[in-house]
Curated annotation (Swiss-Prot):
Residues 118-315 are annotated as: Required for interaction with CAV1. Belongs to the sprouty family. Residues 108-140 have a biased composition (Low complexity). Pfam families: Sprouty. The keyword Membrane applies. This is Protein sprouty homolog 2. It is found in: Cytoplasm, Cytoskeleton; Cell projection, Ruffle membrane. InterPro entries: Sprouty, Sprouty_domain. Antagonist of fibroblast growth factor (FGF) pathways via inhibition of FGF-mediated phosphorylation of ERK1/2. Thereby acts as an antagonist of FGF-induced retinal lens fiber differentiation, may inhibit limb bud outgrowth and may negatively modulate respiratory organogenesis. Inhibits TGFB-induced epithelial-to-mesenchymal transition in retinal lens epithelial cells. Inhibits CBL/C-CBL-mediated EGFR ubiquitination. Residues 177-291 form the SPR domain. The lineage of its organism: Eukaryota, Metazoa, Chordata, Craniata, Vertebrata.
Length: 315
């Protein structure tokens, strides 16, 4: 029992030796003081080092040449506040001068590096913004750039083909005239003008007058029936069911008479067809520029050549 008590009593100095480390029991550890001072700093004190955002993209004012920029406040007051605050919050047991000097040295170094970094970043940002404003000011102040603004849509130049004079073939195209009416007898001028078929929906929908009559008088049903009942591939009865010159004329008219009992609108087909012929003749008479005479003599008219004018001053 005594041996165990002695071994237990002898183990206490062995456990206490690494904790003492050759110092007295009343002397504090400087590392504990440093960690305590670092934990004392709050977020408000750390943010006070840089209280403005220097990397904004907002509009900046061009500095005037007569005015000097206001000096930035020094960070001495911040250092004093940062240094003075931990001293008030120190526990009473840390009152030795060596502990204070060893704890303040790394903290002051970190603050000085942060403040110097903020100064250098401020200088670079202000210098870059001032250089940009100088470039912008010189570009906007230039007079020829403002005067060279295009305000009118430029017109395309005339094509070389438009500037060429009419050739002899173009001049002699309408040289053949009618002896009676005096109008041109070329193929282009004497071709009959049909009624327009794309006059609906801004010339996008195809709707001719013949199709309107076919669908309005139900003749489209008769054409479909004749198309399916015809055995001959060359038979055109379906295209013109009321024709008297084609084959099976009696059969077609008899079938149309029977269908008119169920479709009374078929009785309006022949009057509508006559109105269409009348409208076609009136439209052709108004819009055809050439000759409409059947038997007339053709006269060749020479196109007079105009000599060039001499732009000379009168004497």
């Amino acid at each position: 029992m005594e041996a165990r008590a002695q071994s237990g009593n002898g183990s206490q100095p062995l456990l206490q030796t690494p904790r003492d480390g050759g110092r007295q029991r009343g002397e504090p550890d400087p590392r504990d003081a440093l960690t305590q001072q670092v934990h004392v700093l709050s977020l408000d004190q750390i943010r006070a080092i840089r209280n403005t955002n220097e990397y904004t993209e907002g509009p900046t004012v061009v500095p005037r040449p007569g005015l000097k920029p206001a000096p930035r406040p020094s960070t001495q007051h911040k250092h004093e506040r940062l240094h003075g605050l931990p001293e008030h919050r120190q526990p009473p047991r840390l009152q030795h001068s060596q502990v204070h000097s060893s704890a303040r040295a790394p903290l002051s170094r970190s603050i000085s590096t942060v403040s110097s970094g903020s100064r250098s970043s401020t200088r670079t940002s202000t210098s870059s913004s001032s250089s940009e404003q100088r470039l912008l000011g010189s570009s906007f102040s230039s007079g020829p750039v403002a005067d060279g603004i295009i305000r009118v849509q430029p017109k395309s130049e005339l094509k070389p083909g438009e500037l060429k004079p009419l050739s002899k073939e173009d001049l002699g195209l309408h040289a053949y005239r009618c002896e009676d009416c005096g109008k041109c007898k070329c193929k282009e001028c004497t071709y009959p003008r049909p009624l327009p078929s794309d006059w609906i929906c801004d010339k996008q929908c195809l709707c001719s007058a013949q199709n309107v009559i076919d669908y309005g008088t139900c003749v489209c049903c008769v054409k479909g029936l004749f198309y399916h009942c015809s055995n001959d591939d060359g038979d055109n009865c379906a295209d013109n069911p009321c024709s008297c010159s084609q084959s099976h004329c009696c059969t077609r008219w008899s079938a149309m008479g029977v269908m008119s009992l169920f479709l009374p609108c078929l009785w309006c087909y022949l009057p509508a067809k006559g109105c269409l012929k009348l409208c076609q003749g009136c439209y052709d008479r108004v819009n055809r520029p050439g000759c409409r005479c059947k038997n007339s003599n053709t006269v060749c008219c020479k196109v007079p050549t105009v000599p060039p004018r001499n732009f000379e001053k009168p004497t």
